[in-house]
């Protein structure tokens, strides 16, 4: 009660206090972050030096700490023997060792009865003692009891059928004593022992090799459900095998597929011959052990069960030595064994090739049984086991037992449970049990010959029944995880019906299949933003989540491989309303066989080929386009998006629109391809000496210009409102080669469709795989990789609001305001208009220092101004209120780069310039009050200078126009970038531009 109160007060104390963090930093992409922060290389300790020589590698790779860790890994007993607590653990280990030793003696005696192989009992004893010592030194489980396990040894029946030493009567359950008088009996018996020894030797070699090669990781792929199901199936096999001792009858023993059903049928047939005394002794033992569970002994705060197994074995052994009972015991079986001890010999290596399959199945079954049992015990006591070390330990145990002509050893399910519940805490209990077993078998073997087999069967069944409790937990497991429940049922049914070896293989294969399905059936979530936070969640989970206009965020919840990358592709295309359409035949023909007449008619589709270099390959075979595209210009869109998408012209166009993502490769070719781009994409503008069109013509000219040039986020563009796609790779730790190819194709397809793809939260290993596989190109650069999802969203919003859009400034403030915290609203929103006007300039400075230097903005700026002047004058005369609030505190020189580049204005004195500007300001309102815009007279030839007042009035009008900043920033970047740049980066003085086709 006091603990609950303290927890409640703790929770109340910290839930009432809101924790707020406020972080101000730059938006980082992967390229900028790597430039500002140096990666840590291989160093020696805390010294920041590069390890370049072999001596440095040896010095840094070898240390006293690493040596100790290696020794503790190879010899785990050094860890617990140095920390052993004698006062707390000694009594429990002694009692557990005595109980296990006394149980192991009769189990060794009746081993021949269950495995149907007459193995000398002293050979089993010596091999079990040596194996226990080896596992204490090399094993990692503290409560494991190593020794013979009859279910594993029973798998050798298929081997013994090839060389039966008593005509197979022992396997069939009929003991004919006359067989032992045959002269060839001893020869056949020695051959069968050699077969067992060779199989055990090869099993040990396989297990030792698996441990050396680190194959223990395979056990980690088996979930807890598969381990629980396999142990439950083993427990059920044990119960069925003990029916021989419980009923006191002998039946023919089967091993292999469907053997479980065959054995049940045989027991049902022999049930009328059951021994009632054996059944009564079995019930007595089970009741006594059940009562013992209610008796608890505590020693130094550690619970210890009363050693009832020790009392039952000693009591019934003493009772049967005084009173004759009509029940089955091991005395008859011991009399049938011709030798009590066989000296160690080398296995017969000539028959190893004949037992490879049997050795493989035995090695897998014994290894998995040991590892799964050790993991279950270790989880109960809150420590970890080393699967590779256990494989090495059990391999050494089987190698040693093969020289004693003994069967395969593994962890015993019943003895391990007895050692655990009797109070054993460390492997010292296993040493005590092995010593007790050796002492009793050497000195008092005959004392246990009269122990009833039913009593031993009751002890074994009482300790393995708890493993069947997993069957009762199936409904709850189904509610928790259906995949785990299916794995449990498949493992259990296959191990029961097909045997432990085949069932294990089926369980492994099915578990791998389920894990593969679950890992590759990845979830692609569409994320939205929690308002006023940098938290992004699934749009279907929370009501408060809002979608960011124009930005689609997709989160990949697992690794991306060749299996699920197509699912990701279809999901993204579906959410963005795009479909994959093959090129039509006429479009392909137009693309590659366009005639010169068609080029002359439509100069917007003119493609220039450099014959000195090879034509770049078409990167996107199938063009990603919108289903509701305009039919009249589909060929133009195909040429732009599919053919010129990998060329220089489209490359420069996209870089003008997205200055943040300028790659290093494109910077080298941007100056060379600028003239070609100008010819290929600029519309047919009127010459300078032609009269300006009226307002209606200006509007149609602007519309045709917007249709001819791919203007982002416009209604006439062949795309919807989505301008940025963000892929959240924070949960992705691996991308294979095929997935990289598909991702690159996706990025190029969206790049050609004028949609920017950003990737956020990439792990370092994923970035390295991108770099190794040449993932980055024109469609996706390293500058498009952001450290966090919020960085990518901020970049997408700044890119959106720095260009003309359909949103008003109020809507822009509302959208951007949601990305700031409450504490930043007052400070940041006041400068929102200033920041939106300079976003591209700042982005170009971050993306590439030479971006403003490489662009050539001064070549056709005056021409663009002449086209824009009629529209601006018409808007001013009609009283249109744009309400863009772009009256910034900037100089006129910063707003109008054209005035700076005019040599005649710059040559005038300042006083004369100011007086002329004041005169123009007084005459300007008269111009604005005119109801209609009259056509201006035809300008004079370029050689004659224009009158100064008229030119200054045009310059002033352009500087005061709000759209001037937008279109200048969109096409060439704002003039602030030129004013801030060093003197050598300022563009040259602009000259009049003559079109080649002007009249």
Curated annotation (Swiss-Prot):
Any single GO BP term: cell differentiation
Listed InterPro entries: SLC26A/SulP_dom, SLC26A/SulP_fam, STAS_dom, STAS_dom_sf
Gene (name only): Slc26a8
Extracellular side: 115-117, 161-200, 252-268, 327-354, 412-427, 475-494, 566-999
Species name: Mus musculus (Mouse)
Positions with biased composition (Polar residues): 973-982
Stretches in topological domain Cytoplasmic: 1-93, 139, 222-230, 290-305, 376-390, 449-453, 516-544
Feature: compositional bias, Pro residues: 684-696
Protein name, per record: Testis anion transporter 1
Glycosylation sites: 190
Gene3D superfamilies hit by this protein: STAS domain
